[in-house]
Amino acid sequence: MNQIEQKWQYIWQEEKAFEVSNASSKPKYYVLEMLPYPSGKIHVGHVRNYSIGDVIARFMTMQGFNVLHPMGWDAFGLPAENAAIKNNSHPKKWTYSNIKNMKKQLKSMGFSYDWSREINSCDPEYYKHEQKFFLELYERNLAYQKESFVNWDPVDNTVLANEQVVDGRGWRSGAIVVKRYLKQWFLKITDYAEELLNEIQNLKEWPEAVRSMQEKWIGKSIGANFHFKIKDNEETTIEVFSTKPETIFGASFIGIAFNHPIIERLVSKTPEILAFITQCSHITRSSELEKAEKEGVFTGLFVTHPFDSNIVLPVIITNFVLMDYGTGAIFGCPAHDECDHELAVKMNLSIKQVIKADMDVQKTAYTEDGILINSDFLNGLTSNEAKQEVIGEFEKLGIGKRSVNYRLKDWGISRQRFWGCPIPMIHCEICGIVPVPYKDLPVTLPDDVNFDGHGNPLDHHPSWKHVNCPKCDKPAVRETDTFDTFFESSWYFTRYCNSNATEMTDKKACDYWLPVDKYIGGIEHAVMHLLYARFFTKVMNEQNYVSVREPFKGLFTQGMVLHATYKDEHNNWLYPEEVVKKGNEFFHKESNNRVVQGRIEKMSKSKKNLIDLETMQEQYGADAIRLFVLSDSPPEKDLEWSASGIEGCSRFINKLEYMFKAIDSLKDDVNSEVNKELNRLVHFTIKHVAEDIKHFALNRAIARMRELSNAISAEISKDKIDVKTVRHGFNVLVQLLNPFIPHITEEIWQKLGNKERLYNLSFPAFDESMLELDTYIMAVQVNGKLRDTYEFKTSVSEDEIKQVTVSLPKVQKFLEGKEPKKIILVPRKIVNILV
């Protein structure tokens, strides 16, 4: 099988089978799988993703479309830098070696990529365009620098990504990670929050789950911003944001984030306060803060109620108010908010009910809307009426106004890493921040770098960062941060339209190809990559790089590939190939010690539940792997890897070769009867396989083709064979299977004597008239119970059906000589005789 696959891969390469032109009279179709990170090896999860895309690409080509199906590499990132530290070598060497190997693997799977459009995000010829784009954003005030919290490893003296913080400690040093303010670069994605939110409803071909996740991530909240005066210091106020300002008369405290600026200005830092701030700063993710047990510490400050100066509220530092949401301060209404209630119970704060409820708010917060009580001028109003009224009062008093807040925050793009695209800015003591002139782009990474694992190598480099200021020509320093790698993947799909364009995009080519018709990838990218790509497309549209404002017309999110996990007696993870099954138990192949089978989980390096692709290819071939990952489960569902499943797919491919040999040896028999049912099934399969592929029901399409192959095999085994229909049916079967298993089908097609390649052929056509059955079978019931079945010709009338079924011996037995009261017909399905 490997020889056949290599043969066709060579032919496709020599014939440039999948290279497409930007100038074609055919309608366009752009199918794209999310580009991979070059980690070194393609894994089975990749194969499933790319096999889905390949079926769609090949099918749409057969449907007469000019199909763009490109591939490239998301090549910057932390793993390359970690490998550089480990091996004391440049990450470029590691990355390019991995790309070479993975490209070879992708070609060996027979994927129909247009490799002439390949992109590599760590190539200066690629990232010079995004450096220029960043400068354009800066000119439009869409890029800016400010201080922000980062995860700081005090031993390695470096910033850590969230995934590098394990149980609150640095992954390399083991040091307790702290929050630290550093200057970071941001993009103003929040300027586009409303458009990003509103246009979600137009993404009709996106999964509802992804659309919902983006809506929640953007998180639009309508409420009010207003001020509380500090008691005994009325010149100073704390501004809060609330989505429920109508509950103001239920306020019992002010909650502020642990890093709220007023703490530095007015709060005396007692040991208790310092300890609490430190505790909060060790939590590295906002999601962890939100899930944590609600805690707080009193600051010693009080504020006065905006509508009653006799009411004073304590100001409390909490671990659930976040500085990057709203204003970093809230008023706590424990009776009507769960977080506030939990803290109030713990700190013995008052719980005052201000919305009618048939429950005890001292025990549980009532969080629904209702009628206001205990609320002065708001009493008797509905929640919505009270909200409008109280905001009006804030505006009259000049202490607040209606406001809209978004959970979405500006995108922090700074990474204190080496292996990324350099941010093209210069810091001058005289001129401040100065953009690198366009003529000096790209700013490239140095080759002579020391990777000792401590700090950012760019910051420590003896010469790279030192440069003269473009404005005053005095000594200055380069920005040593690099772009978040999501920067590269937020526009790469536009580059495929013409990967040799001298500018960021070829506008004419983008006008032809964009938007991407079908984008395929994991749902884990719903609120990061997919949102950033939508944001970039809108800005690129305004910069006249593209005409569209949405990048992906259709989105398909495939399920994960799963495998059982195994551990030995010492609790060490084992690879599947190290384990053998004997009866219902598992044992280590070498030691023969008992092995414990764990949960079936997503394949991962850490748990070693991986399948080596190259081993599988040697054993079964690429076509069998492709067929298995597409046939065993709907593409949107998770797929459990099974040896028996891929063996079954391998047998099916071998069966196709056997069928070819058997059919090739047949001689025409003019006396054989025409197998109308087989002919009908051929046309039925053509029609429904096309529909299944269009709806991504690829496993169902494969099941239909297996059914057709079984019917052809059954006909071959007869004494009198309808050779003409068998040959036609087999030809159709080979064509239908080609998008799924392209190597063996091209080989069989050639052996059948065909000169043209399958990849150049149109999808088989079906004849609608052939789908009609000459006969059909109806269930015959008496008083709703099945008593017989009968085969009728399609031309029979309802009266004839009634006469025939009533006279059937098995029916007569239950009629007992009585006349039917009524006969109910469900056309072509059921006759129900009532007596």
Curated annotation (Swiss-Prot):
InterPro entries: aa-tRNA-synth_I_CS, aa-tRNA-synth_Ia, Leu-tRNA-ligase, Leu_tRNA-synth_edit, M/V/L/I-tRNA-synth_anticd-bd, Methionyl/Leucyl_tRNA_Synth, Rossmann-like_a/b/a_fold, tRNAsynth_Ia_anticodon-bd. This is Leucine--tRNA ligase. It comes from Rickettsia conorii (strain ATCC VR-613 / Malish 7). A motif ('KMSKS' region) lies at residues 602-606. GO terms for biological process: leucyl-tRNA aminoacylation. One of its GO terms (molecular function) is aminoacyl-tRNA deacylase activity. One of its GO terms (cellular component) is cytoplasm. The lineage of its organism: Bacteria, Pseudomonadati, Pseudomonadota, Alphaproteobacteria, Rickettsiales. ATP binds at K605. Its EC number is 6.1.1.4. The gene is leuS. It catalyses: tRNA(Leu) + L-leucine + ATP = L-leucyl-tRNA(Leu) + AMP + diphosphate. It comes from the Bacteria. Transmembrane segments: none annotated. Its main location: cytoplasm. Keywords: Aminoacyl-tRNA synthetase, ATP-binding, Cytoplasm, Ligase, Nucleotide-binding, Protein biosynthesis. It is found in: Cytoplasm. Belongs to the class-I aminoacyl-tRNA synthetase family. SUPFAM superfamilies: Anticodon-binding domain of a subclass of class I aminoacyl-tRNA synthetases, Nucleotidylyl transferase, ValRS/IleRS/LeuRS editing domain.
